[in-house]
A protein has these predicted regions:
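Short strand-turn segments of transmembrane beta-barrel domains in outer membranes
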Residues: 81-82, 169-193, 235, 421
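N-terminal periplasmic accessory domains that precede
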Residues: 59, 91-94, 109-110, 129, ...
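Outer-membrane beta-barrel signature, preferentially recognizing the C-terminal barrel domain
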Residues: 420-423, 464-469, 495-549, 566-580
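Periplasmic plug
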Residues: 71, 102-147
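Face-selective signature of the C-terminal outer-membrane beta-barrel domain
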Residues: 246-271, 307, 311-457, 479-486, ...
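Outer-membrane beta-barrel translocator domains and adjoining extracellular loop/strand segments
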Residues: 188, 215-228, 274-304, 349-359, ...
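Transmembrane beta-barrel wall of Gram-negative outer-membrane proteins
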Residues: 184-212, 227-276, 318-331, 476, ...
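Short, acidic, small-residue-rich periplasmic hinge/interaction motif at the N-terminus
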Residues: 21-84, 104-106, 145-146
Length: 656
């Protein structure tokens, strides 16, 4: 009987692939080719295994398709290895195809509704150079966590965890060159060299990027004042160019099976520039007795709209260095720890000459700034296993930031400002994870204390300030895993603290009729998110409710003493609510693998403006379609399309 069992297994494997539930269907196996006997083989008895000649197998081929996307607890997992994504040229190209990720107008990637994610590479926060030269073929999977746990900083909106395979042993080198063309050309060249043994890994990297893109940005601001409505507008055309030189050295040493140490250095040299041409215009309120229903061209004191042209050049330079030491330890079967020590130094400067013309009048303005910052930080994470399904994570971190800077402007009211910043932060967290049967859950609490000081070095100034923040951040998640369904419900609180550029009381020049000033009364923004995720077969969906208290937004005002100018500043607003729905579907049809994403976010928000309640309710939606075609000789063709309607974000409305 043994021979028939072996033969049946081979035939079944050769003629089917796994179904959605992971089982092997046998409908394709022909019963005529399987022989069965009732006799059995006794212990210590030799058995001769024979196969029916008609059923002999010349070759065995197993064909199957694993889904690229699946839910794991409250995270979306994207499989890269052995999927079409493994053939994408760069990590950026892979991230574009992760459901929930989208590319902004300036080319950066963000998570829908949560901003740019914090990226971890094998559970260590990744540097920009690491991500730039990461070999896509080494990536196993990428986790998108939209409800990060208590161990993550309270300002973190989303987390990307990239898990890779270890590089093969030996000496290796890789050179990569790629070119991107839209309106203008962007090119990138990089070289990676390394030496890997069972215990030691030494790698070095150098990369150069010439990044260019053009921007067309029309913008209007309708400013309500006591004497009526002012209109200020800009039609901006910009050309942007940046040259990056990035270097990195990594040394990892596996001291034993339980301990690993490493050191890393990253350097970045950036030179960038932007040239801009603008046509700007403004209009006063209608004079008394003016017909407000007629065309709005003739509405200021002189009887017509005012126009002027502006040209500017902005050049920036940045130099940064980052050192990292780490120790990973497994002290016992149930106890492990991670320790990270970091030092970073950043130095940048920029200058911006502006020329503005209105008729025969011309005004020139020069803005310049520079800053130097040093950052020291340490972090420890401990994991204690209680049992196979229960564990406790706890840890803490400390950081110190010291910096100083200087801003100069030849414009009226501005002059020169020198300042100094000093920030210290301490944090601690505790998180419990458990599970019973089909259910898993986690619950965590995080505490953060932040002290921030700003000192104006130019003169004794009321701008000098010190702020203290003490906040608690709870979070939890619960998951139900069934054979065909996956359900997850999670909650998280986050914060966004105002920067000193928003608080200091400084004045920044934007144009001859627009200045930006700070607001020292700003409060932190607190956000509460409740998320439900579900997966069924090829479909994944998400519903999210977000409440934001004390949102920080721009407002525009017209000073009574200078009516030709308007002032942009920051202000806290009351409750804003957002409702988001998301759907993803993907399937395999022979050589064609389509994947469809769609999301919609509805915003509820209103503002009392000069006694009138103005509603900024509105919907924002986007959709994308990715198509992968498997071609002969291991080639792949991919076609993608995406669209969004711009929509309403806070008080600002965007066009597609």
């Amino acid at each position: 009987m043994k021979k028939e069992i072996v033969l049946w297994t081979m035939l079944a494997t050769a003629t089917c692939a796994t179904a959605q539930n992971g089982k092997f269907p046998t409908s394709g196996v022909c019963a005529d080719s399987i022989q069965t006997e009732n006799d059995s083989i006794k212990a210590n008895q030799e058995a001769e295994i024979k196969a029916d000649k008609e059923a002999e197998i010349q070759a065995v081929t197993v064909t199957g398709h694993r889904p690229m996307y699946k839910m794991r607890n409250d995270a979306l997992v994207t499989r890269v290895r052995n999927t079409p994504l493994a053939k994408e040229p760069t990590l950026e190209d892979v991230l574009k195809h992760i459901p929930g990720m989208k590319q902004t107008s300036d080319g950066t990637l963000e998570v829908n509704g949560l901003g740019a994610p914090t990226i971890y590479l094998n559970d260590k926060k990744a540097t920009s150079a690491e991500l730039a030269h990461l070999d896509v073929k080494l990536i196993d999977e990428i986790e998108l966590i939209t409800t990060p746990g208590a161990k993550y900083d309270a300002t973190t909106g989303a987390v990307l965890r990239i898990l890779t395979r270890r590089t093969d042993e030996g000496i290796f080198g890789k050179m990569q060159v790629y070119d991107k063309l839209s309106e203008v050309n962007t090119n990138h060249e990089e070289l990676t060299l390394g030496w890997v043994t069972k215990k030691i890994s030494l790698t070095g990297f150098y990369g150069y990027t010439d990044n260019r893109y053009n921007v067309h940005q029309p913008q209007e601001a309708l400013v309500r004042a006591k004497d009526g409505e002012y209109l200020f507008g800009t039609d901006r055309y910009g050309k942007n160019k940046a040259n990056y030189n990035a270097t990195e050295l990594n040394f990892d040493w596996l001291l034993s099976k339980q301990h690993e140490v490493g050191i890393q250095w990253e350097g970045l040299w950036l030179n960038g520039g932007r040239s801009e041409k603008q046509q700007q215009y403004y209009r006063y309120p209608n004079p008394a007795g003016e017909d407000t229903n007629r065309e709005m061209k003739l509405s200021d004191a002189d009887g017509e709209m005012k126009y002027f042209d502006a040209e500017s050049q902005q050049w920036g330079h940045q130099r940064s260095h980052h050192f990292n030491l780490f120790h990973l330890a497994k002290w016992s079967k149930h106890l492990s720890s991670q320790i990270y020590l970091d030092y970073a130094r950043n130095k940048d400067s920029d200058s911006q000459p502006i020329t503005e013309k209105e008729g025969s009048e011309m005004q020139e303005t020069l803005n310049r700034s520079n800053s130097n910052y040093d950052i020291y930080s340490g972090r420890i994470e401990v994991k204690q296993l209680i049992s196979d399904k229960h564990s406790i994570n706890y840890g803490g971190e400390w950081s110190l930031m010291e910096g100083k800077g200087k801003t100069e402007s030849s414009a009226d009211m501005l002059g020169t400002t020198e300042y100094k910043n000093h920030d210290t932060k301490t944090a601690a967290y505790l998180q419990y994870q458990g599970g019973v049967g089909k259910w898993t859950w986690w619950v965590g609490i995080r505490y953060e204390h932040l002290t921030s000081r700003y000192t104006n070095l130019s003169e004794e100034s009321p701008d000098n300030m010190e702020r203290h923040y003490d906040q608690w951040f709870p979070s939890f998640g619960i998951t139900l895993n069934e054979p065909s369904w996956h359900h997850s419900l999670s909650f998280r609180t986050t914060t966004a603290r105002p920067s000193f550029s928003q608080l200091s009381g400084s004045i920044y020049y934007i144009s001859r009729f627009q200045y930006q000033i700070s607001n020292p009364k700003l409060q932190p923004v607190n956000t509460y998110r409740l998320t439900y995720s579900v997966q069924w077969k090829d479909f994944m969906g998400m519903l999210r409710y977000t409440r934001t208290d004390h949102s920080i937004m721009y407002i525009h005002e017209v000073p009574e003493d200078k009516p030709v100018r308007y002032v942009s500043t920051f202000m806290n607003f009351n409750k804003m609510q957002k409702y988001m729905a998301y759907l993803n579907w993907g399937h395999v049809f022979g050589c064609w693998r389509p994947n469809v994403n769609a999301s919609i976010t509805y915003q509820r928000f209103s503002v009392n403006d000069h006694g009138e309640l103005i509603s900024y309710n509105g919907a924002t939606w986007n959709a994308s379609l990715d198509n992968y075609f498997t071609l002969p000789n291991d080639y792949q063709l991919s076609l993608s399309y995406s669209f969004d309607n711009g929509g309403q974000v806070g008080k600002t409305k965007f066009s597609p």
